[in-house]
């Protein structure tokens, strides 16, 4: 079963999380001024998630690995959680590649 996008309001703005089928968050977006812009961000994830060159592997100040997904214009689309190891981060990237193409968008009731 593929993952899904959880689209939700954040104050007066909107954001989304890409979630795996077990409901674990894989990628968190920035905040967008409108729901329509957040939906464009979701479309950008779909378009870019399978291209390994779109992922930037990073390390936090506490040496925790994480990744960002960027669009072809270099803008960050989303940010992962902090992982306990590089291998766990690579698994997160693979999960993003598998679940990112999902057409399933969900909003809170």
Predicted regions located by residue number:
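Intrinsic N-terminal pre-sequences and regulatory tails
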Residues: 1-4, 109
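Intrinsically disordered, low-complexity regulatory segments
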Residues: 10, 20, 102-109
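Alpha-helical recognition helix of canonical C2H2 zinc-finger domains
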Residues: 38, 89
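Cysteine/selenocysteine-centered motifs that mediate thiol-based redox chemistry or coordinate metal-sulfur cofactors
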Residues: 57-62, 107-109
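Short, mixed-charge low-complexity intrinsically disordered segments
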Residues: 62, 70, 102-105
